[in-house]
């Protein structure tokens, strides 16, 4: 009996140690309509954020996140610093180096740059000619790149496209399963988090020609826990932090967050956590160096 109890205690300690390696992070819980901060394995802060799909921790400690049909920047004291409201669903936001905020409006098909005062200073429409509503599946995550172009995940069309400042497509690649999140890396490669349309959720790294050079999927993880891959963050040493959204399947075993290395070793997971229903995006609080999100 003592041996059994000792084994159970040791297993729990090992489990907690693994979770602790994920460190402190901010997350978006799509199903609960909140964003939150987890520190030392406890949720210490949260804020209302309906259908949130994108979150950043800014250098000043404030949080920038999408709120269904808006974007909000707040302090840890819940003071509003920036707010943008839209009639279109929004899945993407990004604070730019010039202090403006990039916003991707889904149905409207607009790539916006908004000043700190809330004024639209750049507006690029990427809807096909003759279309006034791209529908809810038109766009998910999007990013403004250092070269001034825009990288957009077209969930419905199952492709990723890069647009120039005039809204012209300069690069594209098909992504069976539907892309949700995109990251352009320093070497020009592109990371894409893929959803569940083909029942093959995965993250792929593509070179400049669109060829897959790295991939992680359920083939690499025992138990096939991946359901729908969402927001992610890539670190210079090759580690990748990514969310596994479980809202379409509602499984008993909820694996919300993974941290893996280039060899596809699982460094930590966050699973079955009280206070979390479905995670759609994440941003580490522990990484002070350059990362890609």
Model regions and ranges:
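Bacterial N-terminal signal peptides
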Residues: 6-17
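Histidine-/acidic-rich catalytic cores in large beta-rich domains
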Residues: 21-293
């Amino acid at each position: 009996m003592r041996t059994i109890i000792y084994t159970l205690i040791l297993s729990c300690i090992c489990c907690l140690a693994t979770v602790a390696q994920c460190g402190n992070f901010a997350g978006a819980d799509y199903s609960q309509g909140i964003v939150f901060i987890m520190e030392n394995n406890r949720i210490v802060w949260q804020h209302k954020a309906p259908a949130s799909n994108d979150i950043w921790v800014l250098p000043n400690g404030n949080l920038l996140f999408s709120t269904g049909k808006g974007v909000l920047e707040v302090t840890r004291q819940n003071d509003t610093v920036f707010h943008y409201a839209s009639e279109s669903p929004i899945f993407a936001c990004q604070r730019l180096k010039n202090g403006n905020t990039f916003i991707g409006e889904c149905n409207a098909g607009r790539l916006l740059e908004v000043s700190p005062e809330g004024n639209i200073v750049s507006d690029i429409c990427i809807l096909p000619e003759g279309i006034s509503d791209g529908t809810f599946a038109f766009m998910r995550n999007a990013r403004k790149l250092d070269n001034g172009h825009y990288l957009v995940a077209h969930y419905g069309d199952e492709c990723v496209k890069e647009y120039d400042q005039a809204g012209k497509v300069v690069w594209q690649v098909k992504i069976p399963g539907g892309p949700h999140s995109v990251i352009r890396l320093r070497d020009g490669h592109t990371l894409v988090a893929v959803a569940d349309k083909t029942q093959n959720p995965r993250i792929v790294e593509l070179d400049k020609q669109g060829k897959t050079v790295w991939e992680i999927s359920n083939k690499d993880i025992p138990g096939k826990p991946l359901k729908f891959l969402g927001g992610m963050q890539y670190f210079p040493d090759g580690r990748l932090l990514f969310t596994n959204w479980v809202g379409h399947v509602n499984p008993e075993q909820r694996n919300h967050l993974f941290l893996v290395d280039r060899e596809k070793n699982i460094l930590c997971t966050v699973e079955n956590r009280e206070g979390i229903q479905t995670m759609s995006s994440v941003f580490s609080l522990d990484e002070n160096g350059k990362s890609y999100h």
